[in-house]
UniProtKB/Swiss-Prot annotation:
Its EC number is 6.3.5.2. Changing N68D: In strain: CA-11.2A. This is GMP synthase [glutamine-hydrolyzing]. Pathway: Purine metabolism; GMP biosynthesis; GMP from XMP (L-Gln route): step 1/1. The gene is guaA. It comes from the Bacteria. InterPro entries: Class_I_gatase-like (IPR029062), GATASE (IPR017926), GMP_synth_C (IPR001674), GMP_synth_GATase (IPR004739), GMP_synthase (IPR022955), GMPS_ATP_PPase_dom (IPR025777), NAD/GMP_synthase (IPR022310), Rossmann-like_a/b/a_fold (IPR014729). GO terms for cellular component: cytosol.
Length: 511
């Protein structure tokens, strides 16, 4: 594919793919590649602009990712974001001060040069999101300061060479006018053309699946979630009956999940094979408390189940997964400069060696794009807007060791939360809601009897893309009702808490 693109050089930021998403939203094709990609390869690409991403690293670290200076001689507009700006300053002879003026969260920015194309059509002050430990102390020669906060230089430019820097993150939804800044860079500075659409990409994906798979068969673990269902219908569109959907009952599912999954067979004419492996999964998780170990065990068990199926049908060659962009980002290892948050069983929990080839047709799309694809595929609202459920299931919502008793307790508590959300017309107003069971017991009193039982935590968030999220401010009356029902109806819980943590710094799931 030689479509002209905006190129994002990834220095390991968790937001690198989010930058790409923002640009694709305005109709411009975007590619994300590692910062260490050889300059020769970059020269051979058809690109109209380059963005240097942020990074968890410090420019002063011995292992800090750096950049070939020759990239600035390509006469292509360049925008550095956060670490990207700091590396520009360092390479051009400016001064970056280590840990001098850290800023995290919301800050007010003031424009010094309102004539710059980067800040065209913007007010002279607005709120932005900062996330940096190092700061610019001295800008390089031939650069000028475009904007500042009370604590740091917020933006610089070399207008002649079309090199720009931002200390803040315009790609994050909570940065005011971030979309406009990105548009200004893409259209006014890079002169990029609109050349990307979701519909066009869908046609391309279907063709790629047909070409890659050929006459071979594909198996897909169907979880009932949006991602796996969209993935299934997309692959079915490409290879029809050669898709075999496998529903593995791990015993770690939501209440009555097996019935809901099997209903999909008739709704969407899917070939679904049901396998009850609940005893095996639970036995393998015995005495395991570490969340990473739980994820990897579950990932391996899934593959074992699928590989046994392939022994029955030698024409099965591919294992399909509904892996999406945010899964990939959060599972990046430190080897690629990105701080690892957690491994997803979709990408980080699979064994290195397996006989099946991997097929991940959705791994370049964000959650809201997946939903749009689902709409185009005719998926019903109750399936399409169902709250996400992790591949490892309740194993990562039970903190610590997983037991059958804890699974039963959590299934009932989580079901009560879901019921009340529907009763109060709140379910579709929240992007994700679930209950976490803590390995913490506390004293309570019920009917003049002393109790010593588990603590449950309600987690509800709103988000556009699952890269950042805000906790949902639910009515106290609703929380009171849910808490009362859980404590009175679920044996084993005598205390309910509400999680009011946003992402970042917290992740949505607890493990």
């Amino acid at each position: 594919m030689n479509t002209q693109a905006i190129l994002v050089l990834d220095f390991g930021s968790q937001y690198s793919q989010l930058i790409a998403r923002r640009i694709r939203e305005i109709g411009v094709y975007t590619k994300v590649i590692p910062y260490y990609t050889p300059l020769k390869e970059i020269k051979n690409m058809n690109i109209s602009g380059i963005i240097l991403s942020g990074s968890p690293a410090s420019v002063y670290s011995k292992e800090a990712p750096t950049l070939n200076m020759e990239i600035f001689n390509l006469k292509i507009p360049i925008l550095g974001i956060c670490y990207g700006m700091q590396i520009i300053v360092k390479l051009f002879g400016g001064l970056v001060s280590k840990d001098s003026k850290q800023e995290y969260g919301s800050s007010e920015i003031f424009l010094r040069d309102e004539k710059s194309l980067l800040f065209s059509e913007l007010p002279n002050k607005f709120q932005i999101i900062m996330s940096h430990g190092d700061s610019i102390e001295k800008i390089p020669d031939n650069f000028k300061q475009l904007a500042f906060t009370k604590n740091c230089i917020a933006s610089i430019s070399n207008e002649t060479q079309k090199i720009y820097g931002l200390q803040f993150h315009p790609e994050v939804t909570h940065s005011e006018f971030g979309d406009q800044i990105i548009k200004n860079f893409v259209f006014k500075i890079c002169q990029a053309q609109i050349n990307w659409s979701l519909e066009g990409n869908l046609e391309t994906i279907v063709k790629k699946i047909k070409l890659k798979v050929g006459s071979k068969k594909v198996i897909l673990g169907l979880s009932g979630g949006t991602d796996s269902l969209v993935c299934a219908l997309l692959i079915k569109k490409a290879i029809n009956e050669n898709l075999i959907c496998v529903f593995v009952n791990t015993g770690l599912l939501r209440k009555n999940e097996d019935k809901k999954i099997l209903e999909l067979k008739h709704q969407y004419d899917l070939n679904i094979k049901y396998i009850d492996a609940s005893t095996k999964f639970l036995n393998r998780l015995k005495n395991i408390s570490d969340p990473e170990e739980k994820r990897k065990i579950i990932g391996k068990e899934f593959v074992d189940v699928f590989e046994k199926i392939t022994l029955e049908d030698q024409n099965i060659e591919y294992l399909a997964q509904g892996t999406i962009y945010s899964d990939v980002i959060e599972s990046k290892s430190k080897d690629s400069s990105s701080s690892k948050i957690k491994s997803h069983h979709n990408v980080g929990g699979l064994p290195d060696k397996m006989s099946l080839k991997l097929l991940e047709p959705l791994n370049e799309f964000f959650k809201d794009e997946i939903i749009q694809i689902g709409i185009n595929l005719g998926i019903k609202k109750e399936s399409l807007y169902r709250h996400p459920f992790p591949g490892p299931g309740l194993a990562i919502r039970i903190i610590g060791e997983v037991t059958q008793e804890k699974i039963n307790i959590l299934q009932e508590a989580d079901n009560i939360l879901t019921e009340e959300l529907f009763i109060n017309d709140l379910y579709y107003q929240i992007r994700q809601a679930f209950v976490v069971l803590l390995p913490v017991k506390s004293v309570g009193v019920m009917g003049d009897q002393r109790t010593y039982e588990y603590t449950a935590v309600i987690r509800c968030v709103n988000t556009q893309d699952f890269m950042t999220a805000e906790w949902t401010e639910l009515p106290y009356s609703f929380l009171k009702k849910v808490s009362s029902r859980i404590i009175n109806e679920v044996r084993g819980i005598n205390r309910v808490c509400y999680d009011i943590s946003s992402k970042p710094p917290s992740t949505i799931e607890w493990e």
